[in-house]
From Swiss-Prot:
Residue pairs linked by disulfide bridges in the UniProt entry: none
Family statement: Belongs to the PIH1 family.
Protein name: PIH1 domain-containing protein 2
Upper classification of the organism: Eukaryota, Metazoa, Chordata, Craniata, Vertebrata
Taxonomic source organism: Mus musculus (Mouse)
CC annotations in GO: protein folding chaperone complex
PANTHER family listed in its UniProt record: PIH1 DOMAIN-CONTAINING PROTEIN 1, PIH1 DOMAIN-CONTAINING PROTEIN 2
Length: 315
């Protein structure tokens, strides 16, 4: 038996001795501890359940296809109320390749009740997808394309890979010796199920946090405002060329009947796509035919025609 194995057995023996002492000196606390461990253990064994998979693209730091697995998991708490933020957990990214195609997989988990509500309401589903993308951008410092599409499959990869990603599991053993150095050994052992707990804590996004990036895609999911039908506006997209037929810029004209103020329009532009949301009445997301220069992009609102005109010079 190696020295490390002996040390491991020693610490396990110490742990059992502590449990024996607790059972003898404080039976009530011992009973509560065991009941909580059984409850947590059962919850820990429950696998995340894949619900849908979306495909989008990472633009920065390196351009790559991205698959986002949205799953429900009982380990994720439900929102405390209809006006509180929605807890969400983001797994670590995993780079993969099939044949010559390289891509990244990221798993995002919600409480089952949250995703069940999304099954009945497309507006809620879109909110949750946008929330997942924003979480990925903020947590991993990625820049994602605004456009996405639902894949024909519910899961990219395996259930086991998804669970390990969300839990941050590694193959090495946790440092039991370090855990026995304080009086809070039992609490530490309970929290040592995953080797890197920073992967698991929920990310709470409030409206204030979301607006810090310039636009608010996230509302409380139970808000009655989600029930408003969002229409796709009429638009005209054209590529302007020079005398030699070389593309110079893209012009997009969007008709927004009933809108009289540019303050109601929210515009997000990336190098490859554009997203327009207007006062919860209109929503337009387009892939652009050419890569554009986002810093040189301009927009103007023609009030008497209720039209938004966007000019996007090519990169």
């Amino acid at each position: 038996m190696t020295v490390s194995s002996k040390g491991l057995l020693t610490h396990i023996s110490q742990f059992w001795n502590m449990l024996d002492d607790l059972a003898e000196n404080d039976p009530e606390r011992y009973r509560n501890f065991i009941q909580q461990e059984l409850k947590d253990g059962k919850q820990l064994c429950v696998n995340p359940e894949p619900q849908l998979c979306i495909q989008t693209k990472i633009l920065k730091p390196n351009e790559k296809v991205l698959f986002i697995n949205l799953c429900q998991w009982e380990r994720i708490p439900a929102p405390q109320s209809a006006t509180r933020p929605v807890p969400v957990s983001v797994g670590r990214p995993e780079d993969s390749a099939e044949a010559s195609d390289a891509y990244t997989i990221i798993d995002v988990a919600y409480n089952p009740g949250v995703l069940q509500a999304a099954e009945k309401d497309q507006g809620i589903k879109d909110q949750l997808i946008r929330m997942a993308m924003l979480c990925i951008e903020e947590r991993l410092q990625f820049t994602l394309a605004h456009s996405y599409h639902l894949t024909s499959f519910r899961l990219k990869g395996s259930i086991q890979r998804m669970k390990e990603s969300l839990m941050g599991i590694k193959t090495d053993f946790p440092d039991l010796k370090a855990m026995t150095r304080t009086e809070n050994t039992l609490a530490r052992i309970r929290s040592s199920t995953v080797s890197e707990p920073n992967h698991l804590p929920e990310v709470l996004l409030t409206k204030k946090q979301a607006s810090a990036k310039g636009r608010c895609l996230i509302e409380e999911i139970s808000s009655s405002e989600i029930q408003v039908e969002v229409k796709k506006p009429a638009y005209e997209l054209k590529v302007v060329k020079d005398r030699n037929e070389k593309p110079l810029k893209i012009e997009l004209k969007v008709e927004l009947p009933g809108i009289k103020s540019v303050s109601l329009c929210e515009l997000s532009v990336s190098e490859v796509d554009i997203l327009i949301e207007v006062s919860e009445m209109y929503r337009l997301c387009l892939n652009l035919p050419e890569s554009i220069n986002t810093e040189m992009t301009t927009a103007k609102f023609v009030k008497n025609k209720s039209a938004l005109i966007i000019t996007m010079p090519l990169a």
